[in-house]
Amino acid sequence: MSRVNPLSSLSLLAVLVLAGCSSQAPQPLKKGEKAIDVASVVRQKMPASVKDRDAWAKDLATTFESQGLAPTLENVCSVLAVAQQESNYQADPAVPGLSKIAWQEIDRRAERMHIPAFLVHTALKIKSPNGKSYSERLDSVRTEKQLSAIFDDLINMVPMGQTLFGSLNPVRTGGPMQVSIAFAEQHTKGYPWKMDGTVRQEVFSRRGGLWFGTYHLLNYPASYSAPIYRFADFNAGWYASRNAAFQNAVSKASGVKLALDGDLIRYDSKEPGKTELATRKLAAKLGMSDSEIRRQLEKGDSFSFEETALYKKVYQLAETKTGKSLPREMLPGIQLESPKITRNLTTAWFAKRVDERRARCMKQ
């Protein structure tokens, strides 16, 4: 589940990639953990009703081996929990009301560009490469894979498509784990299967969706005490749970109320955001300039942020002021926004639901 509109524009173009096979040494096991056979556990834990359960087992086993992930029950159940939550173990899940969502996005873009809707709808009545008109395909679209293919054809074949969308396909997530396509395009190294098409197309496959989704969930170092914080990061971005706790510490130390959303800087601008401005209020006590604060906040999307002087000093100030130890991990307070979501949901809700599924999986 993405915290953003799945039909928002991507920041990267899809690229053609030929991936060579590679594998890494497995991550070390934690104290008390036992290595398991990934494929056997997947077959055991997935419902018998799941189509191609053996293929899921093989793909996930290859994923763990090629990424060098620790083959533990917790890790396997974590991946399965996300896949169940996001797609109910479907490689290309149907999205209720997707046709309406797609038409609304097209109309919204036309309105923004001051193009009459009837002109756009007329242009979409021409035949597409599969013999049906674009309108017919949009009217019957059920999955994000189908919608992504429609937009690819529309952008490549129809001038109106290029006018509305440029060269960027607006479908942003896909596959059994609903992983970000932009994320996948940036993390192809070590992909164990040969791609016949684009990374975007691979994300919509069972194996690609699992591989990139697992990478996003497990393949980064974190100091978290429990899997639930990785589930929140899966939804909100790497280190969002750690960064939300840091924002809490900044708020305690500075007296400035902050949204604990995990975003330490404005990535779309060099202008300071609220967290950066609140941290600047502590500059004298921190013994840092505004530029030093900015440089260290920019490490907020990496593990190394925890080793910065800023991170350590902010906690020292906050804990001295409050007289108590403060958490280093918190579930971000983010409202989930997407045309696919019809209820009032948050990142914390998502993380808790997935964690419940993980716990049930481990008890089976």
From Swiss-Prot:
InterPro entries: DUF1615. One of its GO terms (biological process) is response to peptide. Pfam families: DUF1615. GO terms for cellular component: cytosol; external side of cell outer membrane. This is Uncharacterized protein YaiW. It comes from Escherichia coli (strain K12). The gene is yaiW.
